Amino acid sequence: MPGRLGGSRRAAIIAIGVLLGACPVQAQPAKPAPSRPNIVILLADDWGFSDVGSFGAEFATPHIDALAHAGMRFSNFHVAGSCSPSRAMLQTGVMNHRNGLGNMPETIPDEHRGKPGYDTVMNHRVVTIGELLQAAGYRTYLTGKWHLGSDAARLPHARGYDRAFSLADAGADNFEQRPIEGLYDKANWTENGKPATLPKDYYSSRFVVQRMIDYIGEGRASGKPFLASINFLANHIPVQAPDSDIARYSAMYRDGWTALREARAKRAAALGIVPAGAAMVTMPTTPDWRKLDADERAAAVRVMQAYAGMATAMDREVGRLVAHLKAAGDYDNTIFVFLSDNGAEPTNPFASLRNRLFLDLQYDLATANVGRRGSFSAIGPGWASAASSPLSGYKFSAAEGGLRVPLIIAWPGHADIRAGGITDGLAHVTDILPTLTELAGVAGHGGSWRGRAVEPITGRSLVPMLKGGAGSVHGDAPLGYELSGNAALFRGDYKLVRNLAPTGDGQWRLFNLKVDPGETRDLAAAEPDRYKRMLADYRTYAKANGVLDMPAGYTADEQINRYAFEQQGKPRLIRFGLWVGAFVLLVSGLIWGLRRRRRAKSGWALSRR
């Protein structure tokens, strides 16, 4: 697509820069340390803001919490509202409309397909952290969910990873090699670009950690430092966990999601993650726990127990990895980054009778089986509101519950990073790459890579914040965001936000996140000048990044349903129709044959008379 990076248009775009949210700021490489650090990225899937013990969760995450106490917690860290855009920004340090993920394959409207920035895969105009560190002499490994492209030229082994065992899809079963039924026809696991088969004792969190431990061990003789990116499937739909982990929480969650949301808010405030007494909204999509019947409550309690068990199972694997690195003598010289790709998942896959009937044919949906092998479950909007506590909204929306997630950065053997520190300065997922390259003493690409122009890194190094010397590296600079029509503009302590249906009404609202992280008090009328200025900033950002308006009537949920029908529903209907047609032809042929025989016999009998 030469128009984006060639000729006068390229010059104009880079001159504008990604003016608000994409201002090219290249970290200055630090002097190489005697021994360059290893880097471990722990990417959780669909974990809400308070889904970690050190951010307010009631379930056990002791190993992730240990990293938090060894490093720094970022309580004002933002990603995209859904997975692929966040993952591409994490990989490249480039905003999503410039890295190809202006939207995802499952949610893009037909009108946007093929437009600049709307590739629905990570494009080749960006450079990954794997490519940068690989070129600098690092061993580079990735295990788990990829979801940035499924063809050979876009899988991890072609994007800077020496070895990779990855899932190309948005999600899959956690106990067997099985896709999310109705969305994909198979679970597309590959190793180094070739189709791979999972072991019989597979459980997702255990497997992706063990495969990474194997990779690290097999490459140790080289003496090179390593980048280990572990992309967990937990806690994406389907929510599944080992029986023992579910049983651990058998006495919990009987008071419902509203009580849990309130309890988490109090814990988060006590931990210093949010201001004391921060107000919360009651989301209109949250069901009234008191109106559920006994069976509905039992099913809801069970799925949250499974969700908690799934998180604890993942945390245990983090602990196993850390123990391995300690035993190998690597722990003190390893930088750990823990984050989630977006907020908690609110989807209720059983909301429609059609989906319920389909899933009932594919899975064992009995309450006693929730979370186990052969089950399909999701926490829905009620528990998602608790997972996002005390924020408003969840995955897919541009509200804080969709964009703000836990971030932990630790380097246990490095005194410059404040152990146990918490910062509420604004940080963004594009900031991770320049942070890690600076800490590793690796130069960035400066917009040119192997003789060709590429998108400049738009994130800013968080090293000043890690050292305790800056409130936010973004200062008062505008930082823009858009996905599926849901949009935001951050500037200092303030946020301008718009959510389309079904999570919003399409109106812009203004909030001071410093004192109101729950987005409860719209300041648009009280601060009209700031509102107008930030709206102008957003429009500049949208124009500079090629953001397209959504078609009338668009909703991400409906688009996902269309995608599922096109990918699975229509082919299944066609196959069913062919089967029925073949059956009808067969029966018709048999009937015709029988009638012909009868006629033949009748004719023979008449001829004998």
Task: Give residue spans per PLM region.
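C-terminal cap/loop subdomain of S1 sulfatases and analogous C-terminal strand-loop tails that border
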Residues: 162-163, 167-172, 373-403, 410, ...
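Short, solvent-exposed turn/loop segments enriched in Gly/Ser/Thr/Pro and often Arg
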Residues: 53-59, 73-97, 101-107, 142-154, ...
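Bacterial N-terminal signal peptides
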Residues: 11-22
